[in-house]
Amino acid sequence: MSERIIMDDAAIQRTVTRIAHEILEYNKGTDNLILLGIKTRGEYLANRIQDKIHQIEQQRIPTGTIDITYFRDDIEHMSSLTTKDAIDIDTDITDKVVIIIDDVLYTGRTVRASLDAILLNARPIKIGLAALVDRGHRELPIRADFVGKNIPTSKEETVSVYLEEMDQRNAVIIK
């Protein structure tokens, strides 16, 4: 199976910077802005975007994580952990502008699960979505507000995102 590098380290860094600027424009600054990264790689991307926003605005915005494990629609038994344990952030997200961060947007089911987790716990003013890669093939009517790169793929192909924080390198690869 052949691999194609779609984004290298420099491309990922430029993309994170662009997404940070787009989020600031969308929100007209940092007021009431919250970033929630979908575990695991979305968490690292959210932290990178937070760092870029801090460099641009000299303000550190609240950033946390969403664990969608118990909100997925492909598991049979829901756990009692489906409430407050899904979102890990040190501030209330009610009446805030929440941006969900994910590495790859594919069918939309992961995003749907993250929306369920957020709305079970809070009532944000607005929810946006940022994805490093959008590969298409949606099964739900979900669209990202901020996309790093649109990558047309076949359903048989796999898009893998590698991030330094857990993979010791930065790259987006199609297999």
Curated annotation (Swiss-Prot):
Annotated signal sequence range: none
EC category name: transferase
Keyword check for Lyase: no
Keyword Transcription: yes
UniProt-recorded name of the protein: Bifunctional protein PyrR
EC number(s) recorded for this UniProt protein: 2.4.2.9
Organism for this UniProt entry: Staphylococcus aureus (strain Mu50 / ATCC 700699)
Gene this protein is translated from: pyrR
GO molecular function terms listed in the Swiss-Prot or TrEMBL record: RNA binding; uracil phosphoribosyltransferase activity
GO BP term, example: DNA-templated transcription termination
Motif (PRPP-binding): 98-110
